[in-house]
Amino acid sequence: MENVIQELRDREVGKVLEQEPLANHTTMKIGGPADILIIPNRVEAVKDIMDIVKKHDLPWTVIGRGSNLLVLDEGIRGVVIKLGAGLDHLEIDGDQVTVGGGYSVVRLATSMSKKGMSGLEFAAGIPGSIGGAVYMNAGAHGSDMSEILVKARILFEDGTIEWLTNEEMDFSYRTSVLQKKRPGVCLEAVLQLEQKEREAITAQMQQNKDYRKNTQPYSSPCAGSIFRNPLPDHAGNLVEKAGLKGHQIGGAKVSEMHGNFIVNAGGATAKDVLDLIEYVKKTIREQYDVDMHTEVEIIGGNR
């Protein structure tokens, strides 16, 4: 790996770290080490990184700001590319916004509200990056990324980079084409917003923030929603009805504030979280004959 690390540093692609604990890079504060973690300093650096990765036939993984993510205790082999400060550019052209995949969703929503640009009110309080939000079609309060995305610049598994339109992204509830049909990650996105009264936008965002603050445990280390909603029901409702709020395995605990959240109550391992997820699935299946499916992305180990 030393020659790979030196090559990456010689190309000045950004920060390069060895055996970096991914617990330092996830909102759940859980995760084993990455062999090599790279934080690119610009979009073009991603192409240089991929050239080196392919040259040495290394496995690679991309993460954002670490929300909606559970990294296994074994960590991740090969190269982990973290979209962060180097991919947080922002350009405004009329009502269209071009934003880097590493840009904070909350930061963008707040910034646009101050300019009287509407469309991101639903994102107030959503943790994570724009790249991750596009990848999973993040949403809340009756809206999601599919309603504002014009196109996205995607890095695919084979290392190629191209733009996909909204239609080509094949969005549905908390999914996109990037998850299975054409695995890839969003490096930057073009969003269509609209001008509205700044006071109205700010009021709606504050209402959404207050709702999250009062109903979801973001003051504790967590990944966000653990399960997809088994429509027409809600995952949190089923967990609560099953009496599972507060249930704990090791350091992982079902939040007492919201049933669809698992928090790191102290020293939790990924195994603790996985065991708790399976316990919740089994209990819900036995009590309500409903199969629960995870929304949180689980990566690392042999996955």
From Swiss-Prot:
Q: Name its cellular compartments.
A: Cytoplasm
Top-down, what is the taxonomic lineage of the species of origin? Bacteria, Bacillati, Bacillota, Bacilli, Bacillales
**One Gene Ontology cellular component annotation held by this UniProt entry:** cytosol
Q: Which gene encodes it?
A: murB
> Sorted alphabetically, which Gene3D superfamilies does this protein's record hold?
3.30.465.10, UDP-N-acetylenolpyruvoylglucosamine reductase, C-terminal domain, Uridine Diphospho-n-acetylenolpyruvylglucosamine Reductase, domain 2
Catalytic machinery residues: R174, S225 (proton donor), E295
EC class, as a word, reads oxidoreductase
Per the UniProt entry, what species is this protein from, by scientific name? Bacillus velezensis (strain DSM 23117 / BGSC 10A6 / LMG 26770 / FZB42) (Bacillus amyloliquefaciens subsp. plantarum)
Alphabetically, the GO molecular function entries are: FAD binding; UDP-N-acetylmuramate dehydrogenase activity
Query: What InterPro entries does the database record attribute to this sequence?
Result: FAD-bd_PCMH (IPR016166), FAD-bd_PCMH-like_sf (IPR036318), FAD-bd_PCMH_sub1 (IPR016167), FAD-bd_PCMH_sub2 (IPR016169), MurB (IPR003170), MurB_C (IPR011601), MurB_C_sf (IPR036635), Oxid_FAD_bind_N (IPR006094)
Its required cofactor(s), as named, are:
FAD
Q: Which reaction does it catalyse?
A: UDP-N-acetyl-alpha-D-muramate + NADP(+) = UDP-N-acetyl-3-O-(1-carboxyvinyl)-alpha-D-glucosamine + NADPH + H(+)
Q: Give the range the annotation lists for the signal sequence.
A: none
- Sum up the protein's function in the record's words: Cell wall formation.
One Pfam family, short name please?
Answer: FAD_binding_4
| Coiled-coil residue windows | none
Q: Which family does it belong to?
A: Belongs to the MurB family.
Gene Ontology terms describing biological process? cell division; cell wall organization; peptidoglycan biosynthetic process; regulation of cell shape
Query: What is the protein named?
Result: UDP-N-acetylenolpyruvoylglucosamine reductase
